[in-house]
Amino acid sequence: MQQKLETGIRQLGLDLPAEVTEKLLAYLALLAKWNKVHNLTAVRDPEDMVTLHLLDSLSVLPHVPSGSLLDVGSGAGLPGIVLAICRPDLQVTTIDAVQKKASFMRQAKAELQIDNLQVVAGRVEQFEPEAPFDTVISRAFSEIALFVKLTRHLMAEDGLWLAMKGQMPQEELGAVALKPAKIMSLIVPGLDAQRHLVFLPARQF
């Protein structure tokens, strides 16, 4: 797993310290352990987890601004925990309505000592943080229009939505006349599938 992760990191053009790679592998080991009992993710094989969870999340790393970030429908902490581990400059909050997933994320925060991570258990539309977020990201939460609608109250005035998608989401964008600032095609090492990152600046809404 370590070699696969390190190779993938190089292919993504990232330069991560050894201690960050070690912490990512420790997170993956904890996820695999919990997954045997709590069924947090459908991906069971640790080698597949490297590609489908770690490298998929790491593919957006260069495109995330500094500041505060909210990961909506984070599940087991993807991409939020991965981003928090790699980017100490980010203040990351993850939120999920499923209690067992929030419990896992809290355990990961404690065991891995991720000081720049906060975990919230609850529905995003009912979440009332002390301050709005600079970036709101989702990986597999909902269609883009609903994602924006449910999180609008959480977004800073000059903030940015980042929607991680598979195929080009033209229908989602066209249905609600959303005009993204950019749609970037992402290459995930070892993954033979389309990945796109949609950039939606809050100031246009």
UniProtKB/Swiss-Prot annotation:
**Keywords, sorted A to Z:** Cytoplasm, Methyltransferase, rRNA processing, S-adenosyl-L-methionine, Transferase
Cite the Pfam families for this sequence.
GidB
The chain's coiled-coil residues are none
Cite the EC number. Answer: 2.1.1.170
What this protein catalyses is: guanosine(527) in 16S rRNA + S-adenosyl-L-methionine = N(7)-methylguanosine(527) in 16S rRNA + S-adenosyl-L-homocysteine
Residues bound to S-adenosyl-L-methionine are 73, 78, 124-125, 139
Q: Where in the cell is it found?
A: Cytoplasm
**Membrane-spanning regions, if any?**
none
State the NCBIfam families in the record. rsmG_gidB (TIGR00138)
**What name does this protein carry?**
Ribosomal RNA small subunit methyltransferase G
Upper taxonomic classification of the species?
Bacteria, Pseudomonadati, Pseudomonadota, Betaproteobacteria, Nitrosomonadales
